Amino acid sequence: MSYCPNTPEDIREMLAAIGKGSVEELFEPIHHTLRAKSFNLPAGISEQELLVKMQELAACDRHLINFIGGGYYDHHIPAVVDHLSGRAEFYTAYTPYQPECSQGTLQALFEYQTAICRLTGMEVSNASLYDGGTALAEAAMMALRITGRNRVVIDASVNPFARQIVATYLKNIGVEMVEIPTSSGSADRSALTEALTGDVAAVMVQNPNFFGSIEDLTAISQAAHAKGALLVTSVYPISLGLIKSPGEMGADIVVGDGQSLGNPLAFGGPSFGFIATTKKYIRNLPGRIIGETIDKEGRRGFVLTLQAREQHIKRHKATSNICSNQSLCALRGLIFLASVGKEGMVELANLNRDKAEYAKERLGSIRGVRVLNRGATFNEFTLELPKDAADVVRTLMEKGIAAGVPLGEYYAGMANCMVVTVTEKRSRGEIEALAEALEASL
C-alpha cells in the first residue's frame, strides 16, 4: 500500500471531528514517560540515493551454489508468473465472498483446484492451505474426523519439520502419534504392519521421502485399507511429472508444499500447501472450496461453495481455518503449471532426475563417500560421509557452496549423513565444483 501522509488540513479536520484542539491533546492520556521522544531517523534522501543505498546492502549478500532441499527448492520461475500474479486484480488479501465482485479470482482458484486434482490423481481439491507441513497436519485431523479413531501412524522418513507440526496439532486432543522407524532411508514395512491396529485413523507417508527415496505405495495403501485406515501421502509436486500419482497408488488424501511451483525461496516463505481427496470426503476437507455454477440468466459462474464448513458460520467447529493471503501463492502455482504445461512438467521432472543421477554417481565415487539410497530417487539423495556432515557443510559454505542438509539434528546415528538436492538450475560445472570441494574437505 502506498504511503499517504495526512496534510495539515486533514489533521485539523480529524481533530475537530473528535473534539480535540491539537495532536498533543489527543495523546494526553498516554503518560509522557511512555511517549517516544525521538525516532532517531536520518534525514530523507532522494530516490536515486535510496537505490544506491539498497544496492550497497544487496552487495553484502553471499550468493552460494545451492544444493539444499529438504522441502524448499531452488527452481526456475518463468517471468510470466511474476507478471500475471502482480496484476492489481489479483494482488489483494480480499476473500472473494461476493461472487459478483470476484469472478476473476474465483475462476483462477477453480482452475487451480483442477490443476491440483490432475497433478495428484485425486477428485477434489480445496483452494490452498498455508504450507506443506500444516497441510499434512490438516490431513491428519481430516482422517480423525472421517474414521472417528484416535491413533495416527507416521513414517519417520516424512520431513521432520512436518512431523513436528503434526505432533503439535495432535498432542493436546488425546490422539496418539506413532512414528515408524526408517530402514535404509525407507519405511520399515514390518514395523508399519505391526503398528496398524484397529484404532489407527491414518498412515502418513512421504513420496519421495525426506532422504530422497521413491517408493511404490500400493502395498502400504492396501495394508492401511485392510485395517480401515486412510493413506495420507505427502508429495513433491515437481516429481509428479515423472512418477506415478498418489491417486494411482491408492492414496485417500494427498498433500504437499507448493513452493516449488513458481514461488521463490524467501527465508522459508511464503508458500502454499495443497490438499486433495476423493469426492466422498469433500465435506471433511479443510479450507475454502470454489465451485462452478449457472446463474439465473444461464451464465457460467464461480462461487465459494460448502460454506457451512467455514469459520464465519461454524466458528470453533469449522473445518476451514485458512486465511485469504495464501491464494496469491496458489495463483502463482497455477500460472507456473499452466505456463510449463503437461509435456513441460515431464521434461522438467526428467531434467531434475537426470542431473541428480549424474551428481549421485559423481559424488558417490569419492573415496569414503557412500550413497545410502538403495532404490530409485528423484532429485534428492542421501550421502554418508567419513566425518561429521555439519562440519563438512560449514567448510563448503566458506567455499561458496551450500552442500546440503546435515541429518544429525533430525535422526539419531546419522550425524555423518546429508541430503543433497540437484534441481534443473544446477549445471555440470557446479556439480563438479561440489564434488571437488567435498573431496578436498574429507
Swiss-Prot record:
Pfam families, A to Z = GDC-P
May I ask which residue range the UniProt record assigns to the signal sequence? none
Q: Does the keyword Oxidoreductase apply?
A: yes
Query: GO molecular function of the protein, one example?
Result: glycine dehydrogenase (decarboxylating) activity
Q: Which GO terms describe its biological process?
A: glycine decarboxylation via glycine cleavage system; nucleoside metabolic process
- State its Enzyme Commission number(s): 1.4.4.2
InterPro entries of this UniProt entry? Answer: GcvPA, GDC-P_N, GDC_P, PyrdxlP-dep_Trfase, PyrdxlP-dep_Trfase_major, PyrdxlP-dep_Trfase_small
Q: Does the keyword Transferase apply?
A: no
Subunit and partners? The glycine cleavage system is composed of four proteins: P, T, L and H. In this organism, the P 'protein' is a heterodimer of two subunits.
The protein's matches in HAMAP family, at most eight in alphabetical order, are given as: GcvPA
Which NCBIfam families does the record associate with it?
PRK00451.1 (NF001696)
- What family is this? Belongs to the GcvP family. N-terminal subunit subfamily.
Describe its function: The glycine cleavage system catalyzes the degradation of glycine. The P protein binds the alpha-amino group of glycine through its pyridoxal phosphate cofactor; CO(2) is released and the remaining methylamine moiety is then transferred to the lipoamide cofactor of the H protein.
Q: What is this protein called?
A: Probable glycine dehydrogenase (decarboxylating) subunit 1
Q: Which organism is it from?
A: Geotalea daltonii (strain DSM 22248 / JCM 15807 / FRC-32)
